[in-house]
Amino acid sequence: MMVTVVSNYCQLSQTQLSQTFAEKFTVTEELLQSLKKTALSGDEESIELLHNIALGYDEFGKKAEDILYHIVRNPTNDTLSIIKLIKNACLKLYNLAHTATKHPLKSHDSDNLLFKKLFSPSKLMAIIGEDIPLISEKQSLSKVLLNDKNNELSDGTNFWDKNRQLTTDEIACYLKKIAANAKNTQVNYPTDFYLPNSNSTYLEVALNDNIKSDPSWPKEVQLFPINTGGHWILVSLQKIVNEKNNTQQIKCIIFNSLRALGHEKENSLKRIINSFNSFNCDPTRETPNNKNITDHLTEPEIIFLHADLQQYLSQSCGAFVCMAAQEVIEQMESNSDSAPYTLLKNYADRFKKYSAEEQYEIDFQHRLENRNCYLDKYGDANINHYYRNLEIKNSHPKNRASSKRVS
């Protein structure tokens, strides 16, 4: 394969830049693996070609991006110099795109830019921002990477901060992945506590909507990640059916990684669960099949589990919600008779026994996994969008990359 070296990329105009990447060659799985092997041996041309392929929005673009990201995220003594080359190539692309286009970093401009992955959530962006020295530029990149549609981020948010709060989107991506094949547990989309400009809550709306559409709901353990206002909790809801005496009981566990939640929030949650239970108990309520409810529901069991886990991890409530939910999901799949309270209590007790250093490491490793899930979401969405566009154009997918170097 012939490689053309072009220097002084940052001096190119938009037209010259497009022409530089005009020559194409077909990408295959064999080529990717060959480039990975030579890149790991320190070949700079292979590293830069992987970057050029990674700019693509097809499946090979994502695979090339994954190769580079995996090398950076899993450093060894043998790969430290390789990682430096990868980061340098990423920074060259970043500077190239911004200098050539004369645009500030704004995600809504990305459709008009040559290197879209450098202006949207991507693993290339994650690599780029890690070593950028200017805090203000890191914060600008963070706004794009975290795709802040819910306006959750403060101006000082740093995507690479090891102790920042996880966003709704990050939590949702992780929980969706771990619950994908769960049969005994269902995870609901993370929400705020109150509806905008209202005293009503997202939880009571969700409970009422579900029971109206299916009177036997919930059949599985329901998990609700809820942001109470700068703090995430996990609500577990389960209906226990006793067929012998024809009774049902609602069991609700509120898992809180702090030592307290506050009387207002606790009273609101009690009211919501009691109201939901009363609706279930209403003997005049009819099902969609016009059958009256005959099962008797006893008083609901509501337990607040204040785990007090954040002594060393002040901003990790979202991470604890994800890890606690994962504990429930995995254990319920291996034993459907497990009680969510027991699982959550055991998880909290086990975590407290770790040293401060061990807790930091567990939190750090979870955040890395969470970040991978989040960035993969956008990578997969890019692939789907790419192939949808090809179908619309009645064209077969052609996986191509530039034969030009980034240097």
From Swiss-Prot:
Its EC number is 3.4.22.-. One of its GO terms (molecular function) is cysteine-type peptidase activity. It holds the Pfam family Peptidase_C48. Coiled coil: none annotated. The active site is at 231, 317 (nucleophile). Keywords: Hydrolase, Protease, Thiol protease. The keyword DNA-binding does not apply. InterPro entries: ElaD/SseL-like_N, Papain-like_cys_pep_sf, Peptidase_C48_C. One of its GO terms (biological process) is proteolysis. Protease that can act as an efficient and specific deubiquitinating enzyme in vitro. Does not possess desumoylating and deneddylating activities. The physiological substrate is unknown. Belongs to the peptidase C79 family. This is Protease ElaD. It comes from Escherichia coli O157:H7. The gene is elaD.
